[in-house]
Regions:
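Thiamine diphosphate
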Residues: 1-198, 203
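A general structural motif
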Residues: 22, 203-221, 230
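Short boundary motifs at domain starts and secondary-structure transition points
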Residues: 30-32, 219-223
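A short, charged/proline- and glycine-enriched loop
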Residues: 37, 223-228
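Short cationic amphipathic helices and targeting signals
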Residues: 160, 228-229
Length: 230
């Protein structure tokens, strides 16, 4: 496994600003939508409301309802729609409001989204991001507060990313959108920088203005050690 120090690079970038994780995610999606007309966003309350955790804020005003689709409350339907769009060459970002709800759409996720590429012998790509919120911290009960990234990590065919800071949140979203096969993108509500949740110093940090990728599958140096080799 190779190593990168993305947080240090973000802090030293000449055009960085301090953003919340929510704003960093939305900016990453917007930059990819500007770059690639095949990138679309769909899910419950992701348009007019901007996502209940702010991850799609401003996208409807910027790109319109043809590319930012508020869907009915049917996880099976809109995840299936996203999978079909990906197979046909688009790059959908689908928001599942809470990770806890994945069970009602398990067939679409596990038997279709994750497997189509392999069932086709590698001939069909599924460039799709399934984005979802995890964690608690604001009395929303056990059906809305679980951290289920480990469950997705055990599904063959899935890449799973869980950003812990705004710089990685933007870079990982861009990497996920550009990936040619499914990426499950899980954000913890506690690092989104939402005004109605407890303050978290990790929820706001320098984020470069330009589009950039945080590589998936590379470790980050969180803190350099001082031990010298024997």
């Amino acid at each position: 496994m190779s190593v990168t120090d993305s947080a240090a690079k973000a802090a030293s970038a000449p055009t960085s600003r301090r953003l919340t994780t929510a704003r960093a995610i939305a900016e990453g999606i917007a930059q990819e939508m500007e770059r690639d007309s095949g990138v679309v966003v769909l899910g419950e309350d992701i348009g007019k409301y901007g996502g209940i955790f702010g991850a799609t804020g401003g996208l409807l005003d910027q790109f319109g309802p043809q590319r930012v689709l508020d869907t009915p409350i049917s996880e099976t339907a809109f995840i299936g729609l996203g999978t079909g769009a990906a197979v046909e060459g688009m790059r959908p970002v689908v928001e599942l409001m809470f990770a806890d709800f994945f069970g009602v759409a398990m067939d679409q996720i596990y038997n279709h989204m994750a497997k189509i590429h392999f069932e086709s012998g590698g001939n069909v790509k599924v460039p799709m991001v399934l984005m979802m919120a995890a964690g608690g911290g604001y009395s929303d009960a056990e059906q809305h507060s679980q951290c289920l990234w480990g469950t997705f990590a055990h599904l063959p065919g899935m890449k799973v990313v869980v950003p812990s800071n705004p710089a990685d949140a933007k870079g990982l979203m861009i990497s996920a959108i550009r990936d040619d096969n499914p990426v499950v993108y899980v954000f913890h509500k506690g690092v989104m920088g939402l005004p109605w949740m407890a303050k978290n110093p990790r929820s706001i940090a320098p984020v470069p203005e330009e589009a950039y990728e945080t590589p998936i599958g590379k470790a980050t140096v969180a803190r350099a050690g001082s031990c010298s080799p024997r």
